[in-house]
């Protein structure tokens, strides 16, 4: 009887450990690669991973393209295209699907990045930041393209968005630099 009593806590500990491992693994993924042309890679915790369609994307990933292009869809439906010779870091991604709110922070280190707002920007726009070496962009539910040169100089182009019903609209972005805010 005493050996049975000792086994119950051991089994419970084992089951909880397996559940914790499953939860931590499922929480790590913030999106997927949805389209890929030529080679691109993700650097994750020092490991280099060649990307392909359905490669999971996680917080702290560095996405780097050479002659390739990678499209990413986050779990809140945010879409990001990383074009040729570009580098993008996923700094932070937190999303509550029930409330459709969260926080997104990206760093564009080099090249051209196209951003299309998902649910976080539509419902918690103040919590979406995209940084370059020389500027920071706050997103208010829209699409834009940014280009970062090797010297860090950055340019931004605001684009019209199309909602789920096909209606076109233009959101807004706030660009901040050391010289001020636009």
Question: Where in the sequence are the language-model features?
Answer:
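Serine/proline-rich low-complexity intrinsically disordered segments, especially terminal tails, linkers
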Residues: 4-5, 19, 26-28
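Flexible, surface-exposed loop/linker segments and immediately adjacent secondary-structure boundaries
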Residues: 27-180
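Bacterial N-terminal signal peptides that target proteins for export
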Residues: 2-14
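Bacterial N-terminal signal peptides
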Residues: 13-22
């Amino acid at each position: 009887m005493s050996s049975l009593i000792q086994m119950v806590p051991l089994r419970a500990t084992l089951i909880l450990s397996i559940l914790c491992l499953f939860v931590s693994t499922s929480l790590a993924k913030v999106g997927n690669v949805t389209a890929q042309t030529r080679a691109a890679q993700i650097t994750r915790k020092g490991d280099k991973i060649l990307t392909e369609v359905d490669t999971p994307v996680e917080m702290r990933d560095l996405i780097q393209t050479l002659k390739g292009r990678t499209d990413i869809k986050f779990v809140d439906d945010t879409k990001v295209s990383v074009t040729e010779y570009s580098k993008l870091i996923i700094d932070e991604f937190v999303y509550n699907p029930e409330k459709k709110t969260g926080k997104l922070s990206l760093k564009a280190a080099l090249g051209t990045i196209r951003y299309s707002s998902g649910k976080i920007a539509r419902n918690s726009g103040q919590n979406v930041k995209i940084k370059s070496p020389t500027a920071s962009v706050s997103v208010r539910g829209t699409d834009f393209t940014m280009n970062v040169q090797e010297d860090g100089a950055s340019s931004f182009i605001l684009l019209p968005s199309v909602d789920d019903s096909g209606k076109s609209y233009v959101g807004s972005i706030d660009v901040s630099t050391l010289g001020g805010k636009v």
